[in-house]
Amino acid sequence: MANPPFPLRSQVVTQGVQRSPNRAMLRAVGFRDEDFGKPIVGIANAHSTITPCNIGIQTLAERAEAALRAAGCMPQVFGTITISDGISMGTEGMKYSLVSREVIADSIETVVNGQSMDGLLAIGGCDKNMPGAMIAMARLNVPAIFVYGGTIKPGHYNGRDLTIVSAFEAVGEYSAGRISEDELLAVERHACPGAGSCGGMYTANTMSSAFEAMGMSLPYSSTMAAEDEEKAESAAQSAKVLAEAIQANIRPRDIITRQSIENAISVIMAVGGSTNAVLHFLAIAHAAEVPLTLDDFETIRARVPVLCDLKPSGRFVATDLHRAGGIPQVMKILLNHGLLHGDCLTISGQTIAEVLRDVPDEPSPDQEVIRPWHSPLYPQGHIAILKGNLAPEGAVAKISGVKTPKIAGPARVFNSEESCLQAILAGQIRPGDVVVIRYEGPKGGPGMREMLSPTSAIIGAGLGDSVGLITDGRFSGGTYGMVVGHVAPEAYVGGPIALVEEGDLITIDAPARLLHLHVSEEELARRRARWAPPEPRYKRGVLAKYAKLVSSSSLGAVTDLNLWD
């Protein structure tokens, strides 16, 4: 590539007599005389052997590195971390999951700015890799592209497709006596057949789909299987497109705008995506200095139908969506009905409308994954924002497809995920109960763990349609049922959820978007006078730092909000 028609950031380390020592170091990692005028591009490589989500990423990094060199750039590969949500789920380790989003963002920002890089190609697989990378891109605002590690293919057992959620639910089924130990083990052995992120429209696939919709990843790339050759080819193509974006000086904040975030949220609704996307897009918007609130999600939910029949509540997985036309097919339907901003810029330099020009107006009739406009799965989006005296700042719930959209019942109160799971597996939760899991919020956990173990146990025990669950923690993208998370303010800061007592009547009313505690204001005032914040669970280390800095979930659980106010 020709040198860009503007000074490169990397010139501060590659040009001039004073930078001779800097160049000496760069020569040791492969730079030649002719390379010092080329753009230096960081490859944030989240390869790891601790999780199937990331085990195939090294190949993608190598393909991207070669393509960047061929395009006239100087790639520099650096590592960033990952946490396996599926492996840490239900343990103390899960407290580090959301924390890892900030560590990933901070580490990428640190390397790219610390080394004065001219561009960034980030590759991620497990859930927090995606928002962590995008937060960094929004902060840095150097030309950047995201490459998804790819989705896992479904497992198969006894004539049905399996995902990791099948294994979590099998635990509840076994505990309730509905399956044998041999069947439990068979599900365990077949649920995860190879490399790739969890296969339904769970958090990883939700975020990758949203990034494609936003224009920060290439078309069709978010639903490719990790093990297929087209995934590696897309990594190389992403590198080529990034080199062109550097030449054209297309930056993340040219792409990450209010309108493109609305596009991403619209696609999240249309594909039936994860509630975690709410938390992550609030954080991405904060990093990009784009105004966004919980109420914006509710506004978009009301106008966008669910078009895709995908797990966890539906039938199909991401690879099925890919074969049916992928995210571009979903986007074309939304664009045709005025639900996308077609003039938004993408990393390729094209607008959304230009990218979608040759995509069919309607999905193929010989598939069942993507519904046509006139026959949606649900007429409105599934991620709702609930408010009420139990969640004055708001709470997040999946409401479409719930068989019991309104539950009023006695509170069953637990101050940790572990104590709740123990009660469920012991058969102590009854139909009509409203389970409350608190002190699991951003500060209180800390880290806002996902409650997949208790929710899966409820489903597995056959209580999914008759028991409600609310928490100041989060839910996995694999969760479904009458569950309400992200309750804010959280218990640790004295939110109303801290004042709930065993047996209090609670109403979860999805159609009314209401979360109500049937206790008088006078009684709540008496309880508040008696309440005192608990001792911090951690006083040193990363969890202590996180708990001290993190904001409310209603603001994205970010760690750099109003630091100097």
Curated annotation (Swiss-Prot):
Sites where the protein binds Mg(2+): D85, D127, K128, E450
Active-site residues, as the UniProt record annotates them: S476
Cofactor binding note from Swiss-Prot or TrEMBL: Binds 1 [2Fe-2S] cluster per subunit. This cluster acts as a Lewis acid cofactor.
N6-carboxylysine PTM positions: K128
Pathway(s) per entry: Amino-acid biosynthesis; L-isoleucine biosynthesis; L-isoleucine from 2-oxobutanoate: step 3/4; Amino-acid biosynthesis; L-valine biosynthesis; L-valine from pyruvate: step 3/4
EC assignment: 4.2.1.9
Gene Ontology molecular function: any one: 2 iron, 2 sulfur cluster binding
Binding site for [2Fe-2S] cluster: C53, C126, C198
Listed cofactors: [2Fe-2S] cluster; Mg(2+)
Catalytic function, reaction form: (2R)-2,3-dihydroxy-3-methylbutanoate = 3-methyl-2-oxobutanoate + H2O; (2R,3R)-2,3-dihydroxy-3-methylpentanoate = (S)-3-methyl-2-oxopentanoate + H2O
Keywords, ordered alphabetically: 2Fe-2S, Amino-acid biosynthesis, Branched-chain amino acid biosynthesis, Iron, Iron-sulfur, Lyase, Magnesium, Metal-binding
Family indicated by similarity: Belongs to the IlvD/Edd family.
Assembly and oligomerization: Homodimer.
UniProt xrefs under HAMAP family: IlvD
Function statement: Functions in the biosynthesis of branched-chain amino acids. Catalyzes the dehydration of (2R,3R)-2,3-dihydroxy-3-methylpentanoate (2,3-dihydroxy-3-methylvalerate) into 2-oxo-3-methylpentanoate (2-oxo-3-methylvalerate) and of (2R)-2,3-dihydroxy-3-methylbutanoate (2,3-dihydroxyisovalerate) into 2-oxo-3-methylbutanoate (2-oxoisovalerate), the penultimate precursor to L-isoleucine and L-valine, respectively.
Protein name: Dihydroxy-acid dehydratase
Organism: Synechococcus sp. (strain JA-3-3Ab)
Gene: ilvD
